[in-house]
């Protein structure tokens, strides 16, 4: 009788343990984000100056302990990067390139900068989590953080100025469906329109004032020059 009671207790414990362990894992690793369309996740529009805060708000909810960030959330952040990049090429560059130089083009450029801030915030958050989970992404994290800080500064430099948002048909649950090929010719044309717009409106600060990001100062050494070259090459890449 005593043996039967002990056996029953052991069976009960064995049955409960997997359930408790499973519940514990779910509570620690449950995904934070759900699928979003580009138009749902975008922070572009309104006025420039708060892109940093807006991006962090859109992407809030990850655990403070980044080792516990769920794989599905890393996939989501990567997908945000992808669809924002696609919108940058397929929507913003295309529209800016087709716009007559002037304030309208600059308003589009400000929205493009806001989009870059969201894209790069998602990228940096994902890399920070990957680093916390043991992946060697230090160099990439430093590179993307530098680009993020630059675009945040560009956005803040245009604080209070109108930003014209564009819609784009893409979703984080299937970013490949909206894939847009990189187009250097289109990107250059859009950049030329922004340059001409700055001159036409009398805006100061050159390309950097509109967030084009072209470096005008000579790099201090070859390593810095290489980083600058990489930034120029991947500005419109994932």
Each predicted region: which residue ranges?
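Residue-level signal for the start and early helices of compact helical domains
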Residues: 1, 29-34, 111, 139, ...
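Fungal secretory targeting signals
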Residues: 1-22, 120, 238
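Non-coiled-coil alpha-helical tracts in long, low-complexity regions of eukaryotic assembly proteins
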Residues: 3, 17-69
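Intrinsic structural disorder
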Residues: 5-16, 29, 79, 83-87, ...
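Composition-driven recognition of long, low-complexity, acid-poor segments enriched in small hydrophobic
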Residues: 23-26, 220-224
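Mature extracellular/secreted ectodomains of secretory-pathway proteins
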Residues: 48-221
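Long, low-complexity, intrinsically disordered segments
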Residues: 222-238
